[in-house]
Amino acid sequence: MFGFLKQVGDYTRDAVDAARNLAQGFSVTFDHMKRRPVTVQYPYEKLIPSERYRGRIHYEFDKCIACEVCVRVCPINLPVVDWVMNKATKKKELRNYSIDFGVCIFCGNCVEYCPTNCLSMTEEYELAAFDRHSLNYDNVALGRLPTSVTTDPSVQPLRELAYLPAGEMDPHGVPNDRPRAGQLPSQVLETLAPPAKVGAKNEGQSTGTTQEGEA
């Protein structure tokens, strides 16, 4: 008799614990149901990358001097620089330049240390291909100008949450011309710039006035 009552008590306790756990799980689910959607209907909607987004690398063949600094600073020695030495001019002549984006980690070291600024990071992130060998971009493919999300008429560009105007939580319906929350990198640099020396300017003006008076 006591064994049967113990089994009933254990079963009731387990049922109460299960109901409590279900209630906790559903409370989290119902709480998220009240929130606005944060998903993007890709590819009809695309997020606008940030100003310093590290996407596909853009390469300018005419600026490259084949110094191979990008190869030395790359953590995996990825860029392939094909050049020959011109005996007449005693300078390197670049033949081909390629980067395999299937291996690239988009760290940006090559862009940062390039002495001629022939490399730059773009906002292009759609590099998917059916063949991994197609991800090996030569200098012609690297020289193609990137396509911006905001200029594509078939896509609705959406801002990321950190770049929405103050008080907005849903990027849908927010026009692109509305000011974003915070400042742009160029505006931050302007605020960090040292102020002009007003005393030196006034001193120069007073000196010029004195010279004019003496004349």
UniProtKB/Swiss-Prot annotation:
Its EC number is 7.1.1.-. It catalyses: a plastoquinone + NADH + (n+1) H(+)(in) = a plastoquinol + NAD(+) + n H(+)(out); a plastoquinone + NADPH + (n+1) H(+)(in) = a plastoquinol + NADP(+) + n H(+)(out). Its cofactor is [4Fe-4S] cluster. InterPro entries: 4Fe4S_Fe-S-bd, 4Fe4S_Fe_S_CS, NADH_quinone_OxRdtase_chainI, NDHI. GO terms for molecular function: 4 iron, 4 sulfur cluster binding; iron ion binding; NADH dehydrogenase (ubiquinone) activity; quinone binding. The keyword Iron applies. Keywords: 4Fe-4S, Iron, Iron-sulfur, Membrane, Metal-binding, NAD, NADP, Plastoquinone, Quinone, Repeat, Thylakoid, Translocase. Coiled coil: none annotated. One of its GO terms (cellular component) is plasma membrane-derived thylakoid membrane. Residues 55-84, 95-124 form the 4Fe-4S ferredoxin-type domain. The keyword Transmembrane does not apply. Residues 169-180 have a biased composition (Basic and acidic residues). Pfam families: Fer4_7. [4Fe-4S] cluster 1 binds at residues 64, 67, 70, 114. Belongs to the complex I 23 kDa subunit family. NDH-1 shuttles electrons from an unknown electron donor, via FMN and iron-sulfur (Fe-S) centers, to quinones in the respiratory and/or the photosynthetic chain. The immediate electron acceptor for the enzyme in this species is believed to be plastoquinone. Couples the redox reaction to proton translocation, and thus conserves the redox energy in a proton gradient. This is NAD(P)H-quinone oxidoreductase subunit I. The lineage of its organism: Bacteria, Bacillati, Cyanobacteriota, Cyanophyceae, Synechococcales.
